[in-house]
């Protein structure tokens, strides 16, 4: 067995979780209460990666919902999927983190971490061959940043050898949910840098633009955004759950995408991004999808990939795709001069093909298509996201604005400068990996 446990932290984590589990149930032919639907085709026991089956034939998600305040999780308990989740795997506190990393990490969050680890241990005991853990959280919120970082620290201590992958909502360049987002994001990045093996980032603005421009949603809400994120998460995890001609497991992601431990922030792109009316006019061939994923309009983070160099690239196809077509698409990509790889990693492409076609939520924004592609690329272009964050952090921290709220919650002020230095080092790391080896040799000694 290759079980994966998902932990959804804070409002963003839980709401993305709702969209993901809604999609997983559709993909595995399960009803909202976790039972196999009569007309669903046999899924070859594929769901056991994410679901455990009870003696009564009910499928229960291997997942935890955690939030420091009860509001968002209460909505789940009263929503259409209330019977799907085990009530004990929904853990809430009494007061929220008030957009404050220090509250989520040091004071309010500290009280909740032991019950969370206890529940996680029970989920882990129920697995025969656990592959790893997914942690979903935002960088900007108090619970997502503070408690998310605390959780990853504890996971390193208790489950050191298992793969820990993050799905993070990164602060968008223009859209902001709170003034102190840059502080929270910088602090959580610094804390989790050594504890996370691979972090897939999405930013709300990039997703928002996709919903408006590609999918024709006039006023996208969080449900629209989260359902699109869920498609990306589903594609990344599809080969763990379904058979395929080229399967990719969790450890393979890391091996192929993370050349150095700190450079572990792949950029995700997805194709086709089609609404139902546009679907009739598009061919959606394997080559078309592959080229689309290299365009900035299909990326989940706002940055210009043409400004950077690729270190590694994972192409995860699903549906009606044959390996021969994927290899032909990659061959034509390699002839394009605009797509640059670092000179120390000349081949750079890892292919995955999963036979299960992508599912869509009835009444959702995305059209039903026979095939799709999710591209995960480790590129130096994502350093632009760190530059933006550091700039915003510096503007506030120069005046020590809002710092007293953090220090008042048992945090040392020195942690701010420590985190800032770490991020400066991360920017430098990205700069260095993008430098050609020949240039680096001329500068250094032999």
From Swiss-Prot:
Its cofactor is Mg(2+). Belongs to the tubulin family. GTP binds at residues 11, 69, 138, 142-143, 177, 204, 226. CDD domains: alpha_tubulin. Gene3D superfamilies: Helix hairpin bin, Tubulin/FtsZ, C-terminal domain, Tubulin/FtsZ, GTPase domain. It is found in: Cytoplasm, Cytoskeleton. Residues 34-55 are annotated as: Disordered. The record marks 446 as: Involved in polymerization. This is Tubulin alpha-1B chain. Mg(2+) binds at residue 69. One of its GO terms (molecular function) is hydrolase activity.
């Amino acid at each position: 067995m290759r079980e994966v446990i998902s932990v959804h932290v804070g409002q963003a984590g839980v709401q993305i979780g709702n969209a993901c589990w809604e999609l997983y149930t559709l993909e595995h032919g399960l009803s909202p209460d976790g039972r196999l639907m009569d007309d669903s085709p046999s899924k070859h026991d594929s769901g056991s990666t994410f679901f455990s089956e009870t003696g009564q034939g009910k499928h229960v998600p291997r997942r935890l919902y955690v939030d420091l305040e009860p509001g968002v999780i209460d909505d789940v308990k009263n929503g259409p999927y209330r019977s799907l989740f085990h009530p004990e795997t929904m853990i809430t506190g009494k007061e929220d983190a008030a957009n404050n990393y220090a509250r989520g990490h040091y004071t309010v969050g500290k009280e909740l971490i032991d019950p969370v680890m206890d529940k996680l241990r029970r989920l882990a005991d129920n697995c025969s061959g656990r592959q790893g853990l997914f942690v979903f959280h935002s960088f900007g919120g108090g619970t997502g940043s503070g408690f998310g970082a605390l959780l990853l620290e504890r996971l390193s201590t208790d489950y050191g050898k298992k793969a820990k992958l993050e799905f993070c909502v990164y602060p968008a360049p223009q859209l902001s949910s709170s003034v102190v987002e840059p502080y929270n994001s910088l602090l959580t990045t610094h804390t989790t840098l050594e504890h996370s093996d691979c972090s897939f980032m999405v930013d709300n603005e990039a997703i928002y633009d996709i919903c408006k421009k590609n999918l024709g949603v006039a006023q996208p809400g969080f449900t629209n955004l989260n359902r699109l994120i869920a498609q990306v998460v589903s594609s990344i995890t599809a080969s763990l759950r379904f058979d395929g001609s080229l399967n990719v497991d969790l450890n393979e992601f890391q091996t192929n995408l993370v050349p150095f431990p700190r450079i572990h922030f792949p950029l995700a792109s997805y194709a086709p991004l089609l609404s139902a009316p546009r679907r009739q006019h598009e061919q959606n061939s394997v080559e078309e999808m592959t080229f689309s994923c290299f365009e900035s309009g299909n990326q989940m983070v706002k940055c210009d990939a043409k400004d950077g160099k690729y270190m590694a690239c994972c192409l995860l196809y699903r549906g009606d795709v044959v390996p021969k077509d994927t290899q032909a698409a990659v061959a034509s990509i390699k002839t394009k001069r605009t797509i640059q790889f670092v000179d120390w990693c000349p081949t750079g492409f890892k292919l995955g093909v999963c036979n299960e076609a992508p599912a869509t939520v009835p009444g959702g924004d995305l059209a039903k298509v026979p095939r799709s592609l999710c591209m995960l690329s480790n590129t130096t272009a994502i350093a632009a996201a760190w530059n933006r964050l550091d700039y915003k952090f510096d503007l506030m921290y120069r005046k020590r604005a809002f710092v007293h709220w953090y220090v008042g919650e048992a945090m040392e002020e020195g942690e701010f400068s420590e985190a800032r230095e770490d991020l400066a080092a991360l920017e430098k790391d990205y700069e260095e990996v993008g430098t050609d080896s020949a240039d680096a040799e001329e500068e250094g000694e032999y």
